[in-house]
Amino acid sequence: MSLNPVIFSIGPVSIYWYSLAYVLGIVFAYWYLHRLDDQKIFTKNFYDSLLTATIVGIILGGRLGYVLIYDPVLYISNPIEILKTWEGGMSFHGGAIGVLLAVIISCRRHNIPIFYALDLVSCGVPIGLFLGRIGNFINGELFGRVTTMPWGMVFPESGDNLLHHPSQLYEALFEGLLLFAVANSLFFLTRIRLYHGALTGIAVMWYGIARFFVEFFREPDYQIGYLWLDLTMGQLLSIPMVLLGMLVYLGALNLKFNTKSVT
């Protein structure tokens, strides 16, 4: 399977599907926040501040996370490669930290309840994750392990001409579409949003569990391979995510972050 990662080129400038995925994900989240904020707590200045901070957080956090966690040697020897974000190489965990900091900073600047904002962000972010994984699929990167299943695909970057799991699509489903469905079903059909932070905790737990599971089908990063107990880096990073999500969820229920505390 080989798809052209470039949408079109104008002279030396090329527009990539991967980059478009990020743009569409951010635009959707920005639009969706407006619809979810039924209490009208967010101001225009807050939206503008959050949008700017989120873009910076995703790019810097995602790229630096990948550089530091997955391939520091390559980027130390070729630092110019750090700037080539359109070629892929973004860490979800780094990007998540970047988005978290963006939300915290924007909320503090505009006196917005942090966990109220994080719950709403958790409802929109999964679509960005879905689009990002589709971008990975088009790039032919982050493919799965060798398989005999009929839906296996040949990825040129594997260099072996064997069938591999299209693990990018698995992640797009479990970390993207299903998380979006679960988070929004809970938001609209239950009273969980009365406990600010509970939905954030569930979303973080869901992602960690989904990522841990899908990693069993995903080819480990060639420069890292298998680590402790034959787990991948993605799985090891997902374990603290699940624990953190559980703590946030239980804390939200115990501390009763409900709408009465919103001022």
Curated annotation (Swiss-Prot):
Its EC number is 2.5.1.145. GO terms for molecular function: phosphatidylglycerol-prolipoprotein diacylglyceryl transferase activity. The keyword Cell membrane applies. The keyword Membrane applies. One of its GO terms (biological process) is lipoprotein biosynthetic process. The chain crosses the membrane at residues 6-26, 50-70, 85-105, 112-132, 169-189, 197-217, 233-253. It is an enzyme of class 2 (transferase). This is Phosphatidylglycerol--prolipoprotein diacylglyceryl transferase. The gene is lgt.
